[in-house]
Amino acid sequence: MAGVLSRDAPDIESILALNPRIQAHATLRSTMAKKLDKKHWKRNTDKNCFICEKLENNFDDIKHTTLGERGALREAVRCLKCADAPCQKSCPTSLDIKSFITSIANKNYYGAAKLIFSDNPLGLTCGMVCPTSDLCVGGCNLHATEEGPINIGGLQQFATEVFKAMNIPQIRSPLLPPPEHMPEAYSAKIALFGAGPASISCASFLARLGYSDITIFEKQEYVGGLSTSEIPQFRLPYDVVNFEIELMKDLGVKIICGKSISTDEMTLSTLKENGYKAAFIGIGLPEPKKDHIFQGLTQVQGFYTSKDFLPLVAKGSKPGMCACHSPLPSVRGAVIVLGAGDTAFDCATSALRCGARRVFIVFRKGFANIRAVPEEMELAKEEKCEFLPFLSPRKVIVKDGKIVGMQFVRTEQDETGNWVEDEEQIVRLKADVVISPFGSVLDDPKVIEALSPIKFNRWGLPEVNPETMQTSEPWVFAGGDVVGMANTTVESVNDGKQASWYIHEYIQAQYGALVPSQPTLPLFYTPVDLVDISVEMAGLRFPNPFGLASATPATSTPMIRRAFEAGWGFALTKTFSLDKDIVTNVSPRIIRGTTSGPLYGPGQSSFLNIELISEKTAAYWCHSVTELKADFPDNILIASIMCSYNKNDWMELSKMAEASGADALELNLSCPHGMGERGMGLACGQDPELVRNICRWVRQSVRVPFFAKLTPNVTDIVSIARAAKEGGADGVTATNTVSGLMGLKADGSPWPSVGSGKRTTYGGVSGTTIRPIALRAVTAIARALPGFPILATGGIDSAESGLQFLHSGASVLQVCSAIQNQDFTVIEDYCTGLKALLYLKSIEELSDWDGQSPPTMSHQKGKPVPHIAELMGQKLPSFGPYLERRKKILAASKIRENDQNRACSPLQRKHFNSQKPIPAIKDVIGKSLQYLGTFGELNIMEQVVALIDEEMCINCGKCYMTCNDSGYQAIQFDPETHLPTVSDTCTGCTLCLSVCPIMDCIRMVSRATPYEPKRGLPLAVKPVC
């Protein structure tokens, strides 16, 4: 019987058929068979594939940069968050890229969006369409590494899209007086012409400055400028443009459509007569450039300029853009697109979606001279557009009133670098449609006359000061395409940003007021920023719950000063002693942990240190505390002190610290290395009696609150906390570092190793690795000693992890390792993150969110995937022949949809308002304690099983393997489709979910049938002894 029991049953053997096995010999399979195998499992496009994927009517996102939450978190963690970051210097709007990526890595998507919109009111648009390879990404320091630069655009898009889903309005800066109390200058009438990126940016910043009478006049019946009319839906959806315009309108900016600057409507002169104090011209370049060879050609014949074609595509593909139905332009057969700029590639890929059978991109120079960014070119290449370089157009061939082809001549570059055209080399191409994206101009005489008397330059564009965006008329400013300096959306946004400050300066001067010489544009604000995160503990009011632990970030008091200036709510000094116990440290003494694996740089999950307490004198610390309290009376400063088990020493040092003006004291009874050998730190903190007595001595000596810092290196931390309370402590810090040995090299020597003898000692492990230990300690103390203040420390590296400790019963949060990974500026992320987490709890519509994470949609590569099973009743993976079938099914579905999704009604944005009170910090302290108990209190009747989303599954089989070799063999793995299927033998252990590489691909759902454990043998069978 024992042999039968210890061998897998036949049905289990069948399940294990694809489970990894150790290879005993080389594998042999024919080349022909391997070629077939390759095709079956291929996920990327076959290099020999010449079949164009059917894209008609398919305006789904095609950007390579798009990220889901999983991808965004991985990419954000990979970022180095560099000092003086080159990426920021390369961003036209000077986004604080390092900081917003820090926020994404910490799952503070609101904080990231706030940083982005603070410098760029069109942050989501730019995240989608910015040519980042030529801007921020081009300066990324990770270009110098094997893994390459960060996908900054994708991260920017992700964070701002999550914020968009929160439906939170923009508000005026809380630093401004109420509108009715603003000076008269802020009621000045300001007009902006053109509702494109430059004007939206300019108006947004002016409104943030406090101006209340801002009007944008837009010629079209839709808003957004080229973002709406010429950037395709698959790159920039209209609801994104509308969202950013609604954010601007939240501040009171008005938009009047159907009204333009022209001698027929409004001129600068009439504007001034009507009381406008300043104007901004952001009308773009409305008219297309046309080569003489296209004169007389019409759309009926098959000729379009990009200014004709792209708006038609937009109207037919962007729901909510127009109040009327507009079909897509019918583009059939072969299409020639002239030029190799970004607009040309937009035309080419749009033509495929309008029914083109083949698209030829024809351009004068070679591939090395293509003006478009690599991202755009790559998309066109992937969609099988054909590239024809070194051709210059000569004439269009028309037959029976229709275009049938074009004639070109070859171009060459001579030895001097000049491009010449060889009229003897003639090339003719058949075509049904020709699209000419040859650029744009401003040549409407009515518009030019309406702009009088401003001066124009030799290119026929308004002449502006490049620093102020001011025209020759001091009250008129201009930016965007109409000025000719901005070549991208983000540069147009920056033109508007620049102009806003100097419009402000000009208006204020008209009212006799001065502005700072250094521009100080207000940040982006929402109701989230009004959330109060102050907290009271032991009679002390903390402006926010985040502070410096008594560790490396508090090595000196100038460092504490910088931390307070950055926004930290409190700080502990580095632990100091009486002069008779002064120490000298060894080196090396602080190292990265092995727990992060081969991850180098920031984001280390642990550090180990063998550093002792401060090398500085008690006098230094006491004098410095006095200075800091004088300059930062609202910040809490706690003096951390340490002595041996000596009553007089504790009384002397505690009185000295109190006299310095410290708000409170921390008694370090827990340093796990070095100090214990001196009868200090751990030597005092592991014995309840010693802890109780030390606390009594200090209580007799001082009136200020004091907290005992506990060590996790004990059997029962609650008994130590109880002893501290009995001794008169006002609370405890839980916990200090965990004693450990981080690693040994291949020669057996430790790291860190000190001196030529390569000696070491057990050190203190810190960081997120010890968070489970710290959470356990905090919850255990909070449950045993209700209401007893706890200062948490141990793996706090974000607002999300900080909230976990608050829920566990802590009142304030000490940070060290996270600062070692980064710098003091992480406090901004922690504060905005905590405010957002509290605010979102008040919104009923977001009740299914996990913190700042929205529910995960079924997706691949961050883009929604159709449920093929719903379209055809069959599950198909996304590789090989199944992927091709999926594409064909999707293409047929898109053609069937045709006009179904072309909504006519304008988009309406609904704000989510707080229906419930926004919790204060005190309201969330200890919230999780109700869920903690003994194992015997857990419900064995309510069981769960795993449910796999086949559309998200990437078919790696990790769930299958862990279930086989560490679980219950409850997952089958199809040998052809590699789709895993969970059987009814699933016990709900959750290992599969734990190792799945795709976030939320596996969910644990309630078991529909009673759980009956497999006992191996019936309970009545007696064991063999």
Curated annotation (Swiss-Prot):
Pathway membership: Amino-acid biosynthesis; beta-alanine biosynthesis
Main localisation, per the record? cytoplasm
Name all 4Fe-4S ferredoxin-type domain ranges: 69-100, 944-976, 978-1007
- The residues that the entry says bind [4Fe-4S] cluster 3 are C953, C956, C959, C963
Database matches in InterPro entries:
4Fe4S_Fe-S-bd, 4Fe4S_Fe_S_CS, Aldolase_TIM, Dihydroorotate_DH_cat, DPD_II, FAD/NAD-bd_sf, FAD/NAD-binding_dom, Helical_ferredxn
The UniProt annotation places substrate binding at N609, N668, L669, S670, N736, T737
Q: Which residues carry this modification: Phosphoserine?
A: S905
Q: Where does NADP(+) bind?
A: 340-343, 364-365, 371, 437-439, 481-487
SUPFAM superfamilies documented for this protein: 4Fe-4S ferredoxins, alpha-helical ferredoxin, FMN-linked oxidoreductases, Nucleotide-binding domain
- Give Gene Ontology CC terms: cytoplasm; cytosol
Q: CDD domains under this entry?
A: DHPD_FMN
Disulfide bridge positions per record:
none
Residues modified as N6-acetyllysine are K384
Q: Which parts of the sequence bind [4Fe-4S] cluster 4?
A: C986, C989, C992, C996
Residues the record lists as binding [4Fe-4S] cluster 2: C91, C130, C136, Q156
- Where does the record place the catalytic residues? C671
Which family is this protein grouped under?
Belongs to the dihydropyrimidine dehydrogenase family.
Q: What's this chain's function?
A: Involved in pyrimidine base degradation. Catalyzes the reduction of uracil and thymine. Also involved the degradation of the chemotherapeutic drug 5-fluorouracil.
User: Which proteins does it associate with, and in what oligomeric form?
Assistant: Homodimer.
Q: State the protein's name.
A: Dihydropyrimidine dehydrogenase [NADP(+)]
Q: Which gene encodes it?
A: Dpyd
